[in-house]
């Protein structure tokens, strides 16, 4: 099936590749259309910056998709392997992919139901749903905390009973 993403994008940034890109991206008048329907989104911004130690902060401010930030020192082309290694470390026979040392990231996001509704129409999450955690390549640390006041999946509802909290640490 075909999906259509429309919107106005304004970029005020510097850098010559994704690894040193910093600045602001403004996304306005956005809509996403798929066979299920058309979804309009409030204007939002993505800000990428570095501190004096070259630690990157990416902040997303979208009032109806997701709000939060990722902070860390990592290479985009190694993110997939960082995540795979973190999840794979749960298994005893997992062979991790090689990644550069010194990479880490922390994330903290509030996720809104609209984005879940688009990709997973049978799932609904409550307001104030938060996902946060961190990944560290050197000590293979992986922490994940997911907290939602309510999750509805198909005909199942989880609320106020502790089923909606997931905390995992390695």
Where are these predicted regions, by residue range?
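Interface amphipathic segments
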Residues: 1-170
């Amino acid at each position: 099936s075909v999906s259509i993403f429309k919107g106005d994008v304004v970029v005020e940034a510097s850098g010559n590749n994704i690894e040193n890109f910093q600045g602001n991206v403004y996304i306005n008048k956005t809509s996403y259309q798929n066979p299920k329907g058309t979804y309009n989104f409030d204007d939002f911004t993505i800000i990428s910056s570095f501190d004096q130690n070259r630690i990157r902060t990416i902040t997303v401010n979208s009032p109806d998709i997701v709000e939060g930030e990722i902070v860390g020192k990592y290479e985009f082309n190694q993110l997939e392997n960082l995540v795979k290694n973190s999840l794979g470390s749960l298994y005893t026979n997992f062979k991790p992919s090689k990644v550069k040392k010194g990479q880490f990231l922390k994330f903290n996001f509030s996720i809104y139901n609209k984005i879940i509704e688009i990709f997973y129409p049978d799932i609904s999450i409550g307001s104030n749903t938060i996902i946060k955690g961190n990944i560290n390549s050197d000590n293979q640390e992986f922490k994940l905390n997911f907290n939602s006041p309510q999750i509805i999946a198909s005909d199942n509802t989880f609320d106020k009973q502790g089923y909606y909290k997931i905390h995992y640490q390695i």
